[in-house]
Amino acid sequence: MRMVDLIEYKKNNGEFNQQQIQFIIDGYVDGSIPDYQMSALLMAICFQGLTAKETAMLTQAMEYSGDIIDLSKIEGVKVDKHSTGGVGDKTSLVLGPIVAACGGKMAKMSGRGLGHTGGTLDKLESIPGFNIYVSEEDFIQQVNDIGLAIIGQSATLVPADKKIYALRDVTGTVSCIPLIASSIMSKKLASGADTILLDVKYGNGAFMQTLEDAKKLAQTMIDIGKHCHKDTRATISSMSQPLGKAIGNSLEVIEAIETLKGNGPQDLEELCLKAGSTMLVQAKLYQDEKEAYKALQEVISNGKALEKLKEMVQRQGGDVSYIENPELFEKPSVIMEITSKETGYVKALEAKNLGIVSMKLGGGRMTKDEDVDHAVGLVLNKKIGDHVEIGETLLTVYARNKVSQEIIEEIYQSYTIVDEFVEKPILIEEIVK
């Protein structure tokens, strides 16, 4: 078998079999297939696509390119969730504790932030002492004991995806649905959970710009799950504006703590309750979503959900006093309110722009090796559908140094304010099974 023949074959819309896909993945991981040939193949896939069967076979070949996490020693159904990423997306910090407080077992491996989107690990590391590097043995023990652990991804998990993703990033082949789906699902399948809930986001702050593309991506990943006999479901949610009010690492942890106390933003709470109720049904702990939804509300109101977050922080070496008293989180020296120059209703709020502003303040990274400043970021006062008067605060900036005029202008450009009434947007479009 020759790689050049396979490139020609896909260029002419041929359908690969399992042996051909295995040859490609094995060869690229061991270095016998060079970047330039893999780049040509990825571009051919972008133009010609992959069938559902090809996508599933590609996912499995990638999944088995490295270590597979064995969670069989964890009692009960192991649930996992994955968000396709967005701005202000701190759902794992709320969802993990509420699901575990209802008896769910969530053994989660998370990633870091890159570009305008934040990463769960960066948020957790804003809690002093919190350790994301836990041995597999301790990880399994912790989930058995308290139902929850969130750790960093193993370096030996899905090496094929690491190599292919780095190549896609520099060859204009990122926004290809079969390649996105196989990248996400290979990591989720290798992580060993019994069920997967995907939160597929769309809009200006998300990977997928349109609802139509988000639905296609969700369905592609669900089909992969079915092929691999894994209960996979998806919520399709809007990222037309940031989720919740906080953007930035410790600011988002504080907001997650408030949500676990029942005082969080309505959109964040709604998404976590709906996603959590689907996960509890997947775990066979509840018969239907309504019952599960009530149980999740109950663990928030009786304090068990917050207690579960404290347990996880304590087990992973973090300082629990920060969860008990979020005022302890470091505040940067510059706290600046950005006020409205006009009266009206917020019609649009560019989530991606605000994510980039937070990154420029030091809260995110342009390259994977950069450090992040956990204390900086933004807290929104006004979101889509809110009425605003001249001089009212649109958002508050938390910064290390004087906020530049350029950043202030970028914030103003992120808001569109109109005279006529604006409806608050729908957050969750649908749940796909």
Annotate each language-model stretch with its function:
Residues 5, 10, 15-18, 28, ...:
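Well-ordered secondary-structure scaffolds
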Residues 42-46, 123, 161-170, 199-208, ...:
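Active-site-proximal beta-alpha loop/turn segments in soluble metabolic enzymes
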Residues 123-149, 219-225, 229:
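A glycine-rich helix N-cap at a beta->alpha junction
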Residues 87-96, 100-101, 108-109, 115-118, ...:
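Short glycine/serine/threonine-rich phosphate/pyrophosphate-binding segments
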Residues 47, 93-107, 187-192, 227-228, ...:
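Alpha-helix C-terminal capping segments
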Residues 1, 10-73:
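N-terminal glycine-rich anion-binding loops that anchor highly charged ligand groups
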Residues 144-193:
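Phosphate/diphosphate-binding glycine-rich loops and adjacent basic-rich segments that engage nucleotide
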Residues 49-110, 114:
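Active-site cofactor/substrate anionic-group-binding motifs, chiefly glycine-
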